[in-house]
From Swiss-Prot:
Known role: Plays an important role in the de novo pathway of purine nucleotide biosynthesis. Catalyzes the first committed step in the biosynthesis of AMP from IMP.
Signal peptide range: none
Pathway(s): Purine metabolism; AMP biosynthesis via de novo pathway; AMP from IMP: step 1/2
Full protein name: Adenylosuccinate synthetase
Length: 436
């Protein structure tokens, strides 16, 4: 019987979703991206090979698995083709296994120009920390009903007319408001037309194909990008991304009915990280040697896959995690990077906050309120043994098991999967999301 699983990040992204999606793909006929764009960075370690993906779903490294880019994704076609060529150079078949929705809004040259110019114009405290890849401006065009979509690529005259209208508008903003250079029509148009011919064979009715997979008994895996706390509606606004990153978006962003989403796996690091600006209640110093924050940063290799920026690190925030569990309807948790905490003498869990003199247990909405939150910590014993590469619950140090049990108790949810390293087999399974 077909069973569909949604994988979402419960923090500020970078939770290790790519490895888990790859690991789960053994039980899926297809993997689906449903939001975001090439601002996502998923790193997979398969034997001696490391793959860094932005747009192509993580299931692509599994032979025979179909991959889908749903209508909720904003698509930089030129970047996608570059990513495909890199994978093909490594011996991975892509083009006959990848399907792209014709409804994807297109990221074009002026979107990235707007993104960079706006960020440059902001004062230091107001900077979002955008990747500068044009994601936000493209979603703006979609909501304003002026976006060019994949299906527009295949009508040259229509595409040219819409592009001219968009450039008239956006070049005015770039030159008159932001003091940046205008984007030239010819270069954008010719690049888009060249890319169109190359992606045309991969464009398909993704919604209908996903329905057909389920109807024939095949299961699907929906791969979220970024994380719940970066969601445009539910995140620490305005320090968020421009898409919905939550489980509910899997339906809208791919064209499947919500009743066909059967299990939601919430991916959670054993600590917290954040890239870019915005409030972070449990943040630690990552620069001072021999401190917990510095260990998380260095041992966890906490650098952005897309930007290369050093990630901010802090203790696990259960108030934020509980908020994410509620929003996503999480069925079970997957804890990643537990091994990064090996060797710390004590650990802290944020169990709530003091906000304006009163205790609250859930992360509030809006960055202003989150900034005023003072974390309430519970201290637990660390462990001297190693969790790295553990493949069974019994192989974990007693203190590590106690740490995980406490997360389950406070969040009132089961930890179904534990990742203890980057390789596929460095995983502890307690309950399989696909019911296998």
């Amino acid at each position: 019987m077909a069973k569909n699983v949604v994988v979402v990040g419960t923090q500020w992204g970078d939770e290790g979703k790519g490895k888990i999606v790859d690991w789960l793909t053994d039980h899926a006929r297809g993997v689906v991206r449903f939001q975001g764009g090439h601002n996502a960075g998923h790193t997979l370690v398969i034997g001696a090979n490391e793959y860094k993906l932005n747009l192509v779903p993580s299931g692509i490294v599994r032979e025979g698995v179909a991959c889908y880019i749903g209508n909720g994704v904003v698509l930089d076609a030129h970047h996608l083709l570059s990513e495909i060529r890199t994978l093909e150079a490594g011996g991975i078949r892509v083009r006959d296994r990848l399907r792209i929705s014709p409804g994807c809004p297109l990221i074009l040259g002026y979107h990235a120009a707007l993104d960079r110019a706006r960020e440059a114009a902001k004062s230091a405290g107001d900077k979002i920390g955008t990747t500068g890849k044009g994601i936000g401006p493209t979603y703006e065009d979609k909501v304003a009903r002026r976006a060019l979509r994949v299906y527009d690529l295949f009508d040259r005259e229509r595409f040219a007319a819409k592009l001219r209208a968009n450039l008239d508008y956006h070049n005015f903003v770039l030159t008159q408001h932001l003091g940046a250079e205008a984007v030239e029509f010819g270069s954008v148009f010719e690049q888009a037309m060249a890319d169109a011919e190359e992606i045309r064979p991969m464009v398909a009715d993704v919604s209908a194909e996903l329905y057909a997979v389920n109807k024939s008994g095949g299961s699907l895996l929906f791969e979220g990008a970024q994380g719940t706390l970066l969601d445009i509606d539910h995140g620490t606004y305005p320090f968020v991304t421009s898409s919905n990153c939550v489980a509910g978006q899997a339906a809208a962003g791919s064209g499947v009915g919500p009743g066909r989403l059967h299990y939601v796996l919430g991916i959670t690091k054993a600590y917290c990280t954040r890239v870019g600006g915005g409030p972070f209640p449990t943040e630690l110093d990552i620069e001072t040697a021999d401190t917990p924050g510095q260990q998380m940063s260095s041992k966890g290799r906490e650098f952005g896959t897309v930007t290369g920026r050093k990630r901010r690190c802090g203790w696990l925030d259960l108030g934020a995690l509980k908020r994410s569990i509620i929003i996503n309807g999480v069925t079970g948790l997957c804890i990643t990077k537990l091994d990064v905490l090996d060797g710390l003498s004590e650990l802290k869990l944020c169990t709530g906050y003091m906000l304006d003199g009163r205790r609250i247990d859930l992360l509030p909405m809006g960055s202003e309120e989150v900034t005023r939150c003072e974390p309430i910590f519970e201290t637990m014993a660390g462990w001297s043994g190693t969790t790295f590469g553990a493949q069974s619950w019994e192989a974990l140090p007693q203190e590590a098991r106690a740490y995980l049990h406490r997360i389950e108790e406070i969040c009132e949810i089961a930890i179904d999967v534990i990742s203890t390293g980057p390789e596929r087999d460095e995983t502890i399974l307690r309950r399989h999301p696909f019911g296998a």
